């Protein structure tokens, strides 16, 4: 076995509902607000597309040609610039596997998505983690840490778990400082939720920065977390390399047709994003708003030096959230879900 695996833990998504009920001695139904999922589900067109599939005895299209064609038209990029994977986790793994070797290091932030670090360590690569500044990526400090050993720079924008973002001015200024041999991966898993005018569109920056890789997903805003479909958009040269480490038939037939159907129903997406925006704003109008980091996504981050206590209070209030070292991340749910959250947080800080 690889010796570096000895120090790695197994990723845990949290306890099951039944395990939580036993541990905290609670009954009833939970609001599942731990994984930033879409609480209302995908477009009805997705279910129709999936029900129409009856050739499940055959392997899916290994090249995801139809989905790539749909994404190509949607973003006005060449289909050869697109890589499709079983969620962004697989895309992150492919990029890391293709690019990293023991002689280099990655740059990322301490308080961000853990898979960037996990796959660097699996590839025996050094990880240089830079603290967040006011809950967001500190790109100025990234500049100070870049050197000839830097292989990949990972930027989560908006950031998970804080929900903050770097502006277009901040991002383009940073990209201009990065050597063209260094990959910059811009993880935009939550970009659909951002309604701020100064938020950068990563795909629009690809022509200026050929070393940029943009990641997006159908798991969050489109509500297809159970189907696992993510994708990267970048230069054809990068895609050609990533395809060499891609597993054959990596995305299921049902996932492919579901993603195509979801992409077509943009009105459904807009309606859900509007719902999310309305519900998110209510959190930042609450009496406890000083304990929140300003989020532009489908989740909030509650700052507290007692995250386990808040997590337990939420469980006893019928809400499953995600505890972190310095707070708790809570997905924005339905109106009823969010009322539960408001009640618990108000009580916790009163």
Swiss-Prot record:
Keyword annotations from UniProtKB, A to Z: Amino-acid biosynthesis, Aminotransferase, Histidine biosynthesis, Pyridoxal phosphate, Transferase
BP GO terms, sorted: L-histidine biosynthetic process
Keyword flag Heme: no
EC top class named in words: transferase
InterPro entries: Aminotrans_II_pyridoxalP_BS (IPR001917), Aminotransferase_I/II_large (IPR004839), HisP_aminotrans (IPR005861), HistidinolP_aminotransfase (IPR050106), PyrdxlP-dep_Trfase (IPR015424), PyrdxlP-dep_Trfase_major (IPR015421), PyrdxlP-dep_Trfase_small (IPR015422)
Subunit structure: Homodimer.
Protein name: Histidinol-phosphate aminotransferase
Recorded name of the encoding gene: hisC
């Amino acid at each position: 076995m690889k010796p570096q695996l000895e120090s790695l833990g197994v990723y845990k998504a949290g306890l099951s509902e039944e395990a939580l009920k036993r541990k905290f001695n609670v009954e009833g139904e939970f609001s599942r607000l731990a994984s930033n999922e879409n609480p209302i589900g995908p477009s009805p067109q997705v279910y129709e597309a999936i029900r129409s599939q009856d050739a499940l005895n055959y392997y899916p299209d290994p090249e995801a040609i139809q989905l790539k064609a749909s994404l190509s038209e949607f973003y006005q990029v060449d289909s050869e610039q697109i890589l499709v994977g079983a969620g962004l986790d697989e895309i992150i793994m492919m990029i890391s596997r293709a690019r990293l070797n023991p002689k280099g290091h990655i740059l990322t932030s301490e308080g961000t998505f853990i898979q960037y670090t996990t796959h660097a360590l699996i590839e025996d690569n050094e990880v240089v983690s830079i603290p967040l500044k006011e809950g967001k990526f500190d790109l100025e400090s990234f500049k100070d840490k870049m050197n000839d050993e830097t292989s990949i720079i990972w930027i989560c924008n908006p950031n998970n778990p804080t929900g903050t973002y770097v502006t277009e001015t901040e991002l383009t200024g940073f990209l201009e400082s990065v050597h063209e041999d260094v990959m910059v991966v811009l993880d935009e898993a939550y970009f659909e939720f951002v309604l701020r005018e100064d938020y950068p569109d990563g795909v629009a920056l690809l022509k200026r920065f050929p070393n940029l890789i943009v990641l997006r997903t159908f798991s969050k805003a489109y509500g297809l977390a159970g189907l696992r479909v993510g994708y990267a958009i970048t230069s054809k040269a990068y895609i050609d390399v990533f395809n060499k480490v891609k597993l054959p038939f990596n995305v299921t037939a049902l996932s492919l047709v579901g993603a195509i159907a979801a992409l077509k129903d943009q009105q459904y997406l807009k309606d859900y994003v509007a719902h999310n925006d309305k519900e998110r704003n209510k959190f930042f109008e609450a009496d406890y708003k000083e304990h929140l980091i300003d989020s532009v996504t489908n989740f909030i981050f509650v700052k507290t030096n007692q995250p386990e206590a808040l997590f337990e209070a939420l469980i006893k209030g019928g809400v499953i959230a995600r505890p972190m070292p310095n707070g708790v991340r809570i997905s924005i749910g339905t109106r009823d879900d969010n009322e539960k959250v408001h009640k618990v947080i108000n009580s916790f800080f009163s």
